[in-house]
Amino acid sequence: MIGTGRFARDIAATVDIRTAVSRALTPHVALGRVIMLVNPLSGGVGPNAASEAAGIFADYALEAAIIALEGGQFDVQVQQALDAGPDALFVLAGDGTARAVASRAGPAGPLIAPLPGGTMNMLPRALYGTSDWKSALRQALEEGAEQSVAGGEVSDGRIRESFFCAAILGAPALWAPAREAVREGKFGLAWAYGRRALRRAFSGRLRFSLDGRADRRAEALVLISPMISKAIDEHAGLEAAVMNTADALQAFRLAAHAVFDGWRQDPAVTTRSIQQATVRARSRIPSVIDGEPVLLRHVIKVRFIRTAFRALVPNPPTRAEGV
């Protein structure tokens, strides 16, 4: 059945389409009833996404409800979708929304399918290997299987943010917009972002402790989930990459690696696997959490989550774009 609009109306007014289908569903999990949350205002979604998704769902023998997220109703709509207990919950929205839904679902919730509807789409690209949400949706419907996704949690005492790809803490977080601009071929914009990042590169250093060890200092700390790390095993923990620069020339070299190529090979970077970390600074800490810029307070706690949520991903899983 297909429904669009407000949640209550979606659940009540759907129509069974099991006799009008033409494509086979995945044999790996049962998908009898699914829900899709859509934010039509997100940059990668568009005003026609709900009707386009309904057209795709109509090709399969399942019951589907499509809910358009509304300002001020986000928390209620997400909780209603989770409480409905669907076999899978699809999310076509921005990066932050996808993370929030996956985090709230947790390992006991329904299978989560975060489709690429944001700007950077780090989590969807890691799971589906594409930035085309329609292709990712069909992959999930036709080849989907359950996969436990590990991640981390960052808390500054005021906000608590989950991440499933990477968290960049410190001045090099300012390079994330430049890197994305380069990927999109917007070199003028990348240069502008790069100049801003260099101006702020020495505004403060971090003090941090990994797994309760003695404090150290660094320019930045990057925490990478096992889903995309090329350096650690799946259940070993988070990869902690410590970035240090001694002078402006080193900072520029590290910035170039961050924008253009493999930063891990830079001599200013050291890595290890961890379960938890504490990070401090004299001022608020610029950060990027799964592609979204966040300004955190001056004391941060980070912890590894072995099973953060259960994802609906292609079988065999798409190889994530590792870092």
Set out the residue ranges of the language-model regions.
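ATP/nucleoside-binding phosphotransfer catalytic cores, i.e., glycine-rich phosphate-binding loops
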Residues: I2-A24, H235, V242-V323
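Short glycine/serine/threonine-rich phosphate/pyrophosphate-binding segments
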Residues: T97-V101, M122
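ATP/NTP phosphate-donor binding region
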Residues: M1-L92, R99, K134-L137, T318-V323
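Active-site beta-loop-alpha substructure in enzyme catalytic cores
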Residues: R216-Q250
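Conserved Motif II region of HX4D acyltransferases
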Residues: G96-T97, A173, G291
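Catalytic core of DAGKc-family lipid kinases
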Residues: L37, Y60, A68, G106-A113, ...
